[in-house]
Amino acid sequence: MAKKIAEKFKMMIPAGSANPSPPVGPALGQRGVNIMEFCKAFNEKTKDKMGFKIPVIVTVYVDKSFTFETKQPPASDLILKAAGIKKGTDNPILNKVGSITKAKLDEVIDQKIADLNTNDREAAAKILAGTCRSMGIEIVD
């Protein structure tokens, strides 16, 4: 018989650097989860994605055990890294802060398509192109 789920919640944690301090410690502690066990498991699983904030879905069971599922970093973070810039613009209509090639956008699609709500590469390209547009990043050939 499957374990009974007590609660499911989401967090964004920097890859490889989960520690018991806020916001991780309080979020887990109030649910009765072993904080250090979570931190060690999360850091081990995400050590290859350093520099990104990783979305994680934590499932807590009634016996206070837990499982967690990591997702890919946010599309905006992947795009910023591919474009080689620190942050997007506050006014994407007037200000363009950088550009990204279609080849680099395809690399981002390869990483992110599992987490998007589509399996079609063309639709995924449109989703990520919209993200680029809203950040003030142009797509060039």
Swiss-Prot record:
Keywords: Methylation, Ribonucleoprotein, Ribosomal protein, RNA-binding, rRNA-binding. GO terms for molecular function: large ribosomal subunit rRNA binding; structural constituent of ribosome. GO terms for cellular component: cytosolic large ribosomal subunit. Forms part of the ribosomal stalk which helps the ribosome interact with GTP-bound translation factors. Part of the ribosomal stalk of the 50S ribosomal subunit. Interacts with L10 and the large rRNA to form the base of the stalk. L10 forms an elongated spine to which L12 dimers bind in a sequential fashion forming a multimeric L10(L12)X complex. PANTHER family: 60S RIBOSOMAL PROTEIN L12 (PTHR11661), LARGE RIBOSOMAL SUBUNIT PROTEIN UL11M (PTHR11661:SF1). This is Large ribosomal subunit protein uL11. It comes from Sulfurovum sp. (strain NBC37-1).
